[in-house]
Amino acid sequence: MRQAIMSYQNLVSEAGLTQKHLIYGDKELFQHELKTIFARNWLFLTHDSLIPSPGDYVKAKMGVDEVIVSRQNDGSVRAFLNVCRHRGKTIVDAEAGNAKGFVCGYHGWGYGSNGELQSVPFEKELYGDAIKKKCLGLKEVPRIESFHGFIYGCFDAEAPPLIDYLGDVAWYLEPTFKHSGGLELVGPPAKVVVKGNWKVFAENFVGDIYHIGWTHASILRAGQAIFAPLAGNAMLPPEGTGLQATTKYGSGIGVSLDAYSGVQSADLVPEMMAFGGAKQEKLAKEIGDVRARIYRSQVNGTVFPNNCFLTGAGVFKVFNPIDENTTEAWTYAIVEKDMPEDLKRRLADAAQRSTGPAGYWESDDNDNMVLSQNAKKYQSSNSDLIADLGFGKDVYGDECYPGVVSKSAFSETNHRGFYRAYQAHISSSNWAEFENTSRNWHTELTKTTDR
């Protein structure tokens, strides 16, 4: 066994400046991540718009576990492992639907939409009084919370409330998620399995604007809207047009200012800019010029660990781990509730064309995501990967922008924040230890010496 994974203590250096390459390909570490990352943190499940009525349900993933997310008769949302308590068979095969309950296809055990075991074939004849149905309901996800219609679940009772977990990321998201009038999620998600470690996808979304001009050069040259001047690394983004912000719990945000129409098809730009411009004027009076401008920008980001998005481009993703080298990407579209129906449809179509399974942006990115395969190689696995772009320039306590902030579009600020939190989790046995390790998180990330 290779170095017993170095006791999980030093895979990421202080301030997240370097990461051991093996974090992308080690089987033992992946199993440890399921325990310390996916069983501990808040994970995206679904959106109110996909389960609006009692009995509506969708399937979601929490790490490698599949769950049923169901709207209850009282309007609340509950989630349960999609596993029969009798012999462990998957209960629900459909991706979504409406049902009063769920019946296992193996022996016919029936559960209510509230997860309670309601019926057992030949219960009295075969079991007598031995079956304690109240004790044999589906295993429930103990914590469900919502952020402006976006529903998250968590298995850990010690985790902070969702709004605290999001931290300063919520400040950047609320102009679009709340003050715009709200969002709808367009599903079902398009799904594709990619040979890459889940973290590679998460870090790409959390703050990697640096790759756009080179990786996506051919698309940009074909006239892909706002970012076309960057094609082939022809130029840097003008100063003052972008920023990044990272948080205590690893979530991060990148803002491409005024790029509301983002990476979508050029024919959407005039209509998107007109729609967003009119709303920006209204929002400026309600939430101030700074946050109204964020609304009319493209915001890329990752809610730690694996929920990613591009607002202004209509893209919303979950990167579900399968194993240390394989990830299933789920791609939804997000649209504003008050958009004209035709614009919603076209934006959702454009989001899938660009970043769905066969998307032209997605194809470029997936070529890079397989970099994790090198983590399986003996010499490569023990090398250090660097994430020091912009280190020493980040600030905490900016007068306009919360979080640890870089005033540059090209920075690895958010990589460092993501991996600082990642290391704190994998080397901690519970939330209390994580909090103790993270008490000086912003000081660590804003050091100007000791690279």
Swiss-Prot record:
It comes from the Bacteria. Residues 42-126 form the Rieske domain. CDD domains: RHO_alpha_C_NDO-like (cd08881). It is an enzyme of class 1 (oxidoreductase). Its EC number is 1.14.12.24. InterPro entries: RHO_NdoB-like_C, Rieske_2Fe-2S, Rieske_2Fe-2S_sf, Ring-hydroxy_dOase_2Fe2S_BS, Ring_hydroxy_dOase_asu_C_dom, Rng_hydr_dOase-A. The keyword Electron transport does not apply. [2Fe-2S] cluster binds at residues 84, 86, 104, 107. Fe cation binds at residues 211, 216, 365. It catalyses: 2,4-dinitrotoluene + NADH + O2 = 4-methyl-5-nitrocatechol + nitrite + NAD(+). Pfam families: Rieske, Ring_hydroxyl_A. Belongs to the bacterial ring-hydroxylating dioxygenase alpha subunit family. Component of the 2,4-dinitrotoluene dioxygenase (DNTDO) multicomponent enzyme system which catalyzes the incorporation of both atoms of molecular oxygen into 2,4-dinitrotoluene (DNT) to form 4-methyl-5-nitrocatechol (MNC) and nitrite. The alpha subunit has a catalytic role in the holoenzyme. Also able to convert naphthalene to cis-(1R,2S)-dihydroxy-1,2-dihydronaphthalene. This is 2,4-dinitrotoluene dioxygenase system, large oxygenase component. The gene is dntAc.
